[in-house]
Each structure stands twice: as structure tokens, then as C-alpha cells.
């Protein structure tokens, strides 16, 4: 009986554990619960506008959303496709909201066709798979003929083809997504014919794609802004780049960064695009034009930074000539450009099609000696922004004065930006030559960088400066070493010169010192070459002879103090008069008894 009871208790515990761990799907509007997401969607009482909350757990199913619903999870609901022939989630209704899921496998992670107003946010979508090429397969998210949808803050990775595939879809917002390890393209916007896209693609991070970071094929009027793209290979096809614009017109491509890609900017038959303020770094080919399609023309391509490339422009047919590569203010920055500054911050000779390449021109503008030290003003006279070229670089500055040398580093400067370099060396009185320089190599590269200075003639600057008088604190310290209280009358003057200088200060003091008492007289701050003159009178009011034991210390800040000790007897009703002049040097100390 005891064994039977224990067995029953064990079965109850196991049963309760299973109930507690079971996945739960709840319609907040009807309060009904389900074990499958599709059951909750298909329930007759589930209608447009309902909110379905999906609890933590594994859901093995392919889901069809054919109602305007909100499906939400807290990030712990995992949807595994049961069939690889279908997308894990297929959306066939407008105004659907999908949030907080881990979506694995399927023909696509999420497939949307002929829908509008849907939001896909804060999901992880991975491992969509097809065995060969398909127009609408192997994508993390696939939009077909869909408008005004928002795809944001998703992690999309390890998909056979594209991270996000957008086919003949308009007015969509794709932003703040992280897309990694795409077998095809990170974000692919395309159509079978030219179409008005008006999609916004911004602030996405695309890492490791095979055929392109962001690829536009035939859509027009899209905005591609502030995306970061890294590690895009050519997939063996040769037509690839961080950003690819292929028979796609009137797009704005601005403020994007592409690094470590086979190609930076890939173009083919594009018209009227504005491609400005982008950075392409460590790409094998900075700009390449396809040899297959029509020529690209009337595009604005300026204000971009092409850094550390092997080939600047690949254009075998010369089809990129009919584009606007610069304004009157400047063109693009090319790291391999070797021309010099013309005085306006741009190069003196064209670089391929760019007639006004942006250059770096660091210059020492001025040197000043101040009471606090030496100041050197450094300015970037070029129109290239060093912060964009290498935001982590340090620029070496060297300053020398007399026999002292000071070396330091400054942060990169934007175009036209100045910075003050301060050296806390106090320049003494008199004339001194100060030299400041921005070191560079024989080829004109700034030391410690891969940045060429387009005008080294202004990298060195010397200036004769007048030093400053250094004010120091003057003090007199008196100590009564005797056993009697004494009263001292002190007349103190400050002179500009120890011998015959002008008097600049005068004080009369009466000081009483008890036995073993010390008092300090603060005289103020004066140039260290000034002198202190003091006349001290000590009177003996007694009718008896008394001993006088007194220590006097004259001190100028930073110089050796001078001390005198007086030990003598004072006559009855007599006085002792002591006169001294102090300059801070032993030979300048004179006393009279």
C-alpha cells in the first residue's frame, strides 16, 4: 500500500510539472487559452484587432496569419517550422504585429504578400533554407507587393539567401535591424521592372553577406542612410559591394559605412542618385561600374571617403564619366591621392573623374607664450575630415624652446577645426625662439598614420616670443629663541632692484613675540628678481641688561631661504637696530649691525 501511494504521488507531481511547463497561448480579448499559435488564430472568436500573447516554450508549426492580429512574446517563444516547404510565418492580412519571437527554419522566416501596415519587431529570425535559387525563398523576411510596413530591431542571421528580401514593395521602413551571415544579400530591394520604391532603409547593421550589403535592383526614390555594412564578398560573381545600385534611379544614399568588403560602391546603369557622405574603408575596389548594363549618368557622387583600397575606380568602359563627382566646394576623399593642397582644402590635380579631391592639410597656425605656459594652435586647413578617415588616430605634435623638447598627441580634426596644444613650460623673461612642428615622413604621411598631409610647408613654424616675469611669494619669518617677550618695530620695503631699484611697496609693522614663538609676515607676490629691504628695531625698556636671541628667515618662493640668528645682550634702555636687504641669493644678502 505504501509503495502504491508513493507511485501515485510521483505520477501527480509529474503530471503537475507537465502542466506547469506546457506552452500557453492566450487571446487577451477573449481570455481563451490554446496550446498552439495557429489554434488561437483560427478560433472563430478571434477577430481583427485581437492581441494574442504567446508564452515561453517551443512551438513546432508553420503559422498563417490571415487576420489583423497582434502576436507577442517576451522573447522566450521559439517557433520551429514543421515543414521546410512553407515559411515559418506567413502573413496574408493587413495591420499584423509580430513581436518578440525566435523564428527558426522554414522556406522563409516571415513571408508577407500583398499586405500593408504590418510591423515586425524585436524578433530573432534564423536558418531559413532552400536548396537552390528561388525568388521568394531562403530569406529571413520576405516582402512581396507589400506597402507601408515596418521592420525594425530584429536579429536576422544564417539564412540561405537574403536577410530581408523586398520585391516590388513600396513605402516600407526597414531600420535598426542586425543582419548576419546571409548567403545572398543583406537587404535586397528589387523588381521585375522599374518601380517607385520610396522605401527607407536606415541604421541597420549588416555583417557577412555574399553578394552585397544593400542591393537596389530597379526601385527608385529610396533612402539608404546611416547603415553599417562589413565583410561582404563577391561570391565569385564579381558584381558586389557594400552598397549596390543597379538600374535604380533617384535614390538618396547617405552617411553609410562599408568596411572590409570586396567592393565599396557598385553601380550599373543608375540615374540621378545622390551618393554623399558615405565611408568605404578597406574595400578592394572603392567604386566599380558593371560592364553589362547601360552607363550610369547624372549621379551626384561627392563628400564620400574611400580609404585603404587596392583599386580606386574600376570602369573598363569609361561609363562613370558623366556623373557629378564634385561641387565647387570639393569632391571625395581618396586615401591614395598624392596631389597637394591648392589653398582651398582640395587637391591641385584631378583624381580619375574627381576634379577637387578632398585633402588633409595640418598646419601650425600660431605660437604664444602665456603666463601659464606655451600654447600652439594646430588647424586642419584641408576639407577632409580626419575623424572620418580614422577616428582613433593620434596626431603627433612636437614643441621645443631653448633646450627643452615637448612631444604630445592630439585627436583627429575635422575640416577647418583648430586645437590648442598647451605645454606648461614657463618662458622666462627675455627673448626666446619657440619651434612647433607636425612630424611627417619623406612621402608626406603624418607620423604614425596612413594619412597624407597635402602641404608639408606649414608643418613647421618658429616664432620669437617675449617671456613673462614670474611672480613669487615673499615672506619673512621671525622666531624668538630667548626667554623674554620682545617687541619689534619693522619697516619693510620691496624694490625692483637690489641696489638702486624703485620702491614698489612699503609696510610698518609692530610685532610682539613671546618666548619660543614664531610669526610669519606675508609680503605678497613679486617678480623673483625683486629685493626685500628691512629695518628692524628692538628696544629694551628695562633698566637692566637683557639677552636678545632672534632668528630671521627671508624667503622667496622657489629660491633658497636666507637665515640669520642674532644672539646678544641689549644695554639698559637701549635698542638694537638691524638692516638687511635680501634678493634670494647669498651674495645679495647684506646686513648691518
UniProtKB/Swiss-Prot annotation:
**Superkingdom of origin organism:** Archaea
The places in or outside the cell where this protein is found are:
Secreted, Cell wall, S-layer
* InterPro entries hit by this protein: Carb-bd_sugar_hydrolysis-dom, NosD_dom, Para_beta_helix_rpt-2, PbH1, Pectin_lyas_fold, Pectin_lyase_fold/virulence
Gene Ontology CC terms, in alphabetical order: extracellular region; S-layer
Residues carrying sugar: 29, 58, 66, 74, 114, 122, 145, 148, 158, 176, 208, 231, 326, 336, 340, 431, 471, 500, 516
Q: What is its main location?
A: secreted
**UniProt keyword list:** Cell wall, Cell wall biogenesis/degradation, Glycoprotein, S-layer, Secreted, Signal
Q: Which residues form the signal peptide?
A: 1-22
Q: Which GO terms describe its biological process?
A: cell wall organization
Q: How is it modified after translation?
A: Glycosylated.
Assembly and partners?
Assemble into mono-layered crystalline arrays.
This chain belongs to the protein called Cell surface glycoprotein
Q: Which organism is it from?
A: Methanothermus sociabilis
Q: Which gene encodes it?
A: slgA
Amino acid at each position: 500500500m505504501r509503495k502504491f501511494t508513493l507511485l501515485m504521488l510521483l505520477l501527480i507531481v509529474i503530471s503537475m510539472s507537465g502542466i506547469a511547463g506546457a506552452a500557453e497561448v492566450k487571446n487577451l480579448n477573449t481570455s481563451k487559452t490554446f496550446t498552439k499559435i495557429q489554434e488561437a488564430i483560427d478560433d472563430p472568436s478571434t477577430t481583427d484587432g485581437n492581441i494574442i500573447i504567446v508564452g515561453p516554450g517551443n512551438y513546432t508549426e508553420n503559422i498563417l496569419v490571415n487576420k489583423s492580429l497582434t502576436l507577442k512574446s517576451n522573447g522566450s517563444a521559439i517557433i520551429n517550422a514543421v515543414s521546410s516547404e512553407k515559411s515559418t510565418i506567413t502573413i496574408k492580412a493587413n495591420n499584423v504585429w509580430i513581436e518578440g519571437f525566435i523564428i527558426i527554419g522554414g522556406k522563409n522566416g516571415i513571408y508577407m504578400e500583398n499586405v500593408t501596415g504590418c510591423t515586425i519587431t524585436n524578433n530573432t529570425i534564423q536558418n531559413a533554407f532552400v536548396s537552390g535559387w528561388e525568388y521568394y525563398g531562403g530569406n529571413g523576411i520576405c516582402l512581396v507587393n507589400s506597402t507601408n510596413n515596418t521592420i525594425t530591431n530584429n536579429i536576422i542571421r544564417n539564412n540561405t539567401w537574403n536577410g530581408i528580401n523586398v520585391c516590388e514593395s513600396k513605402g516600407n521602413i526597414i531600420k535598426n535591424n542586425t543582419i548576419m551571415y546571409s548567403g545572398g544579400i543583406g537587404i535586397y530591394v528589387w523588381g521585375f521592372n522599374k518601380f517607385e520604391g520610396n522605401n527607407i532603409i536606415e541604421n541597420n547593421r549588416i555583417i557577412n553577406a555574399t553578394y552585397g550589403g544593400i542591393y537596389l535592383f530597379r526601385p527608385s526614390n529610396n533612402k539608404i542612410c546611416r547603415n553599417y555594412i562589413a565583410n561582404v564578398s563577391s561570391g565569385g560573381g564579381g558584381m558586389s559591394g557594400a552598397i549596390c545600385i543597379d538600374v535604380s534611379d533617384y535614390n538618396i544614399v547617405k552617411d553609410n559605412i562599408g568596411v572590409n568588403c570586396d567592393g565599396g560602391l557598385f553601380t550599373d546603369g543608375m540615374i540621378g542618385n545622390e551618393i554623399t557622405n558615405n565611408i568605404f574603408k578597406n574595400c578592394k575596389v572603392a567604386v566599380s561600374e558593371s560592364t553589362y548594363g547601360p552607363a550610369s549618368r547624372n549621379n551626384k557622387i561627392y563628400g564620400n571617403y574611400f580609404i585603404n583600397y587596392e583599386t580606386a575606380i574600376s570602369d573598363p568602359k569609361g561609363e562613370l564619366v558623366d556623373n557629378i563627382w564634385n561641387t565647387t566646394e570639393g569632391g571625395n576623399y581618396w586615401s591614395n591621392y598624392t596631389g597637394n593642397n591648392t589653398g582651398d582644402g582640395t587637391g591641385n590635380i584631378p583624381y580619375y573623374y574627381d576634379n577637387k579631391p578632398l585633402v588633409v592639410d595640418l598646419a601650425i597656425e600660431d605660437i604664444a607664450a602665456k603666463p601659464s605656459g606655451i600654447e600652439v594652435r594646430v588647424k586642419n586647413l584641408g576639407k577632409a575630415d580626419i575623424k572620418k578617415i580614422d577616428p582613433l588616430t593620434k596626431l603627433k605634435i612636437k614643441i621645443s624652446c631653448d633646450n627643452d623638447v615637448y612631444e604630445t598627441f592630439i585627436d583627429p580634426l575635422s575640416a577647418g577645426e583648430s586645437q590648442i596644444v598647451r605645454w606648461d613650460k614657463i618662458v622666462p623673461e627675455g627673448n626666446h625662439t619657440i619651434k612647433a612642428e607636425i612630424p611627417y615622413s619623406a612621402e608626406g604621411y603624418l607620423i604614425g598614420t596612413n594619412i597624407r598631409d597635402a602641404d608639408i610647408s606649414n608643418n613647421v613654424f618658429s616664432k620669437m616670443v617675449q617671456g613673462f616675469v614670474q611672480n613669487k611669494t615673499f615672506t619673512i619669518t621671525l622666531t624668538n629663541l630667548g626667554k623674554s617677550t620682545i617687541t619689534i618695530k619693522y619697516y619693510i620695503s620691496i624694490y625692483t632692484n637690489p641696489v638702486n631699484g624703485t620702491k614698489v611697496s612699503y609696510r610698518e609693522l609692530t610685532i610682539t613675540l613671546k618666548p619660543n614663538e614664531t610669526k610669519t609676515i606675508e609680503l605678497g607676490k613679486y617678480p623673483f628678481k625683486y629685493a626685500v629691504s628691512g629695518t628692524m628695531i628692538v628696544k629694551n625698556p628695562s633698566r637692566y641688561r637683557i639677552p636678545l636671541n632672534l632668528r630671521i628667515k627671508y624667503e622667496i618662493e622657489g629660491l633658497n631661504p636666507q637665515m640669520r640668528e642674532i644672539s646678544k645682550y641689549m644695554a639698559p634702555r637701549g635698542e638694537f637696530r638691524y638692516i638687511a636687504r635680501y634678493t634670494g641669493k647669498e651674495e645679495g644678502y647684506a646686513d648691518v649691525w
